[in-house]
Swiss-Prot record:
Belongs to the peptidase M24B family. Bacterial-type prolidase subfamily. PANTHER family: XAA-PRO AMINOPEPTIDASE 3, XAA-PRO DIPEPTIDASE. One of its GO terms (molecular function) is metal ion binding. This is Xaa-Pro dipeptidase. Keywords: Dipeptidase, Hydrolase, Manganese, Metal-binding, Metalloprotease, Protease. The gene is pepQ. It catalyses: Xaa-L-Pro dipeptide + H2O = an L-alpha-amino acid + L-proline. GO terms for cellular component: cytosol. It comes from the Bacteria. Mn(2+) 1 binds at D258, H340, E385, E424. Mn(2+) 2 binds at D247, D258, E424. InterPro entries: Creatin/AminoP/Spt16_N (IPR029149), Creatinase/aminopeptidase-like (IPR036005), PepQ_N (IPR048819), Pept_M24 (IPR000994), Peptidase_M24B_aminopep-P_CS (IPR001131), X-Pro_dipept-like (IPR052433), X_Pro_dipept (IPR022846).
Amino acid sequence: MEKLASLYHEHISTLQQRTCEALARNQFDALLIHSGELQHIFLDDRDYPFKVNACFKAWVPVTKVPNCWLWVDGINKPKLWFYSPVDYWHSVEPLPTSYWTKEVEMIHLANAGDINSALSTYVKQNVAYIGCSPQRAKEIGFSERNINPKSVLDYLHFHRSYKTDYELVCMREAQKTAIVGHLAAYEAFQAGMSEFDINISYLMATGHRDTDVPYNNIIAMNENAAVLHYTALQHNAPSDIRSFLIDAGAEYNGYAADITRTYSAKSNNEFASLIKDMDAEQKALISTIKVGTRYTEYHIQMHHRIAKLLKKYGIVKDVSEEVMVEEGLTTPFFPHGIGHPLGLQVHDVAGFMQDDTGTHLAAPDMYPYLRCTRILEPRMVLTIEPGLYFIESLLAPWRESEFSKHFDWNKIGTLKLFGGIRIEDNIVIHENKVENMTRDLQLP
């Protein structure tokens, strides 16, 4: 914890420097960052699960407490109004005392409505509000111009791509937790459990509730693995278990892990061989990644690797790998991007920003679902998650195309029973190497 405290001190110093620059560029004196508010379910007396503002948890590892407010000006110690009411209906977070609390001035907020008077001397013309409730900001006294100003957010989001040492430690810890869950889920799969029960096994192993994980776990067997964001969780195991895809993460101090593995129920069939080769291609792709190259290039490179696999397994025949990629024959098999930035959010911000003024570079027209077009630089954290699926809705147009004769539709029909493959690691870009946080922890 001592090391974490030291790294957190450096982290706050970095955030203060970024804030100073963002404020100076935009003629603001300070930022007021709101943790968020509970959202009521329509015509009910309950709330949706609370999800904290990522801009807030960038500063303090407070992820489950609404109605908190953070004042930062880049120079003085940040002020944190921490909401901790007297409440016998609900559990309440006490004022924290931890490795990070000496870096902020803690102010007890006993009633959420008291924030208006508490902030009366702070809300001035040159203060910006960052948060999810423009209406609350207006009630406090913010003008429309000062609510979530785009130029401020663009600057902060762009620089959030470069993780501090504290953030990298937190992300490595999230990896450890997620991997414990993945190993437990694999054991549950081997024991013949259902998707629902495998998910329970994962949550128990990680110590997460289903509202704590950074995204809804994807636990998919057989054809369900062809649904990219499958979250239905069948309660009964299939009578014939053929394959298992798990895409599940964990969170540590607000930072996410996002890991995917695919398994064949039998080790001696063609699908198992395809998984093994896909795993090799994913690792080979990572070995080519280096500073100064646009992320888009690795997405395109992976399409060439997918073409090689399609040809090797006779899924697509009598056409060169180059033509497969040029004509888009690989796209129905690999319809999503190679990955995305990772951090405080699973799909972290600024994937398309080319500079800190927010210059946008969209994904190529041919690959519209790619989530990052940045040039890779040290301290960036990204996922590498190639996929190879057998999705009828994407394959159907090719049945009637001029290239239909090159597809082995009988083989595709057989492989559709397995759904698909996705293999995902989380990597850190360093000056002279790529750190694979996932593989470094020995997840096969």
